[in-house]
A protein has these predicted regions:
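Post-signal peptide N-terminal segment of mature Sec-exported envelope proteins
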Residues: 33-57
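C-terminal motif of bacterial Sec signal peptides marking the signal peptidase cleavage site
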Residues: 22-25
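Bacterial N-terminal signal peptides that target proteins for export
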Residues: 2-14
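Exported/periplasmic cell-wall-interacting domains
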Residues: 29-33, 37, 75-78, 96-210
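Structural motif
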Residues: 48-50, 85, 126
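Electropositive
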Residues: 64-96
Length: 210
């Protein structure tokens, strides 16, 4: 995928970010479903409108996404994307065809192509998120998801109503890679700008980008 940082840059950035997050994001006012997928983590940059998937501490894939057009926040009814440490609480859509439309998390039977005119439903897969911090603990009740969107032309800029949108094939790919319980860290800043404290001697494996 064009416009993404180089693999080495992403590797160093992810180490720095995860180290910083581990020091600041798990205080005494935190909540967690516990258990589940502890090997995969996702870092979502609001500034970059990109998601980095990290497996066992190594970045494996980057995706173009879209967060809320109303900004960031946790207030009910605000349609904002929450910041902080979230977790995948439920996975919905096993085996659904690419482009399958969901309404209240149930398939309607309709299938849409990317950029279908005049349509903006939840499609393909749903990763229902829960908050793990006092500030974002209402995330599950607010029904904040990572989900597919037919409006793929708008990915890379804020366009959602609070959820984290992905292209249909990308969200299906992510869905197959991670399990319930995986952490999702939503940050204001850029992934690249947080790389300075990383270990520059770390080795980098091959990363699959699209």
């Amino acid at each position: 995928m064009t416009g993404f940082p180089k693999p080495r840059t992403l590797f160093l950035a992810s180490i720095s970010l995860l180290a910083a997050i581990s020091l600041t994001g798990c205080g005494s006012n935190s909540f967690s479903f516990g258990g589940g997928d502890t090997r995969n983590k996702m870092i979502v940059s609001v500034r970059d409108q990109k998601m980095l998937l990290v497996h066992d501490g190594t970045p494996v894939k980057a995706y173009k996404i879209s967060t809320s057009k109303f900004g960031i926040g946790d207030r009910p009814g605000s349609n904002c994307t929450p910041l902080g440490r979230l977790q995948v609480a439920k996975k919905i859509g096993d085996g659904a065809p690419i482009g399958s439309v969901f309404k209240t998390r149930r398939q309607t039977g309709e299938v849409l192509r990317p950029n279908a005119p005049g349509r903006d439903p939840v499609v393909t897969r749903i990763l229902w998120l829960t908050g793990t911090e006092s500030r974002n603990q209402n995330t599950f009740r607010r029904t904040i998801y990572i989900h597919g969107t037919p409006e793929e032309r708008r990915l890379g800029s804020p366009a959602s109503f609070g959820c984290i949108r992905m292209g249909s094939r990308d969200v299906a790919d992510l869905y197959n890679r991670i399990g319930a319980g995986a952490d999702v860290f939503v940050i204001r800043g850029s992934i690249q700008s947080n790389r300075s404290s990383a270990d520059s001697s770390a080795s980098v494996g091959k990363i699959g980008f699209r």
